[in-house]
Regions:
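Structural preference for solvent-exposed beta-strand-turn elements
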Residues: 1-245
Length: 245
């Protein structure tokens, strides 16, 4: 595998991907890695912790197709430390090298077969203006709890209302509700609970796009903004009756 790309482009995507990679799963070291796949002039970066995943598609100067998995944090830190300009990434045996100008770094790799398949929701997507959705998330997500002992409060409720989609979050002390009229993402009476961590990462992605597509199906939610796709498991738990708070 070998490709060339602008440092800034690669650093931004790797930085976002590395935030999703697992830092605690010693049983599956590959979950701390970023999967780098080159096909022609397209680069696919993927990170996942099995619950939350993110993928980026970048245009690069592809020189040799291939797949490699290496530490997401290490790759991100190295590329970010390099000077502006083109960066070359290539595999040699069981290592991947990153070079730019006189600087060159070598990183060990994981077995690509140990990296799990990324599952996305499969249903017709609904498109929203990224700025509108980002504003709604900014108002609501901050009210969710960060206490994992109160799992139901760590998510954001998305519920179908007659006028569109309603977003709700609460930590039992604060309550935030935002309606998105005309956003018919869910069927009548349907509701899902999305982890606030996933929506915090989504907010970062929304800043760089004009539109966002949402797909809710089964036990997953998938969001696409530009060349980035974020997918998360839904919280299989009953959200509190916020109308009584």
């Amino acid at each position: 595998m070998k490709f060339r790309v602008e440092r800034e482009v690669l650093a931004e995507a790797l930085g976002a991907a590395a935030r999703v990679a697992s830092t605690r799963n010693n049983a599956m070291p590959a979950l701390s890695g970023v999967r780098i796949e080159v096909t022609g002039d397209k680069l696919l970066l993927s990170c996942t912790d099995n619950d939350l995943s993110v993928q980026f598609v970048l245009n690069v100067g592809g020189q040799e197709d291939g797949v490699v998995v290496a530490s997401a944090k290490l790759m991100s830190d190295i590329v970010r430390s390099m000077s502006e300009g083109k960066v070359t990434v290539e595999t040699t045996g069981e290592t991947v090298s990153i070079s730019s100008g006189r600087a060159q770094f070598t990183v060990p790799t994981f077995a690509a077969t140990d990296f799990p398949n990324i599952v996305q929701a499969s249903a017709p997507p609904v498109t929203l203006a990224a700025s509108v959705f980002a504003d709604a998330l900014r108002q609501v997500v901050r009210a969710a709890s960060s206490d994992m002992q109160r799992l139901a409060l760590t998510g954001v409720l998305m519920a179908a209302e007659p006028e569109g989609l309603r977003l709700v979050a609460t930590d039992s002390y604060r309550l935030a509700v935002r309606d998105l009229p005309g956003s018919n993402i869910l069927g009548h009476g349907e509701k899902v609970v999305i982890p606030s961590r996933a929506l915090n990462e989504l907010q970062r992605l929304l800043a760089s796009g004009e539109e966002a597509s949402l797909c809710l199906a089964g036990d997953r939610a998938t969001f696409t903004v530009g060349q980035a796709t974020l997918s998360t498991s839904l919280l299989q738990i009953e959200f509190p009756n916020y109308r009584q708070l």
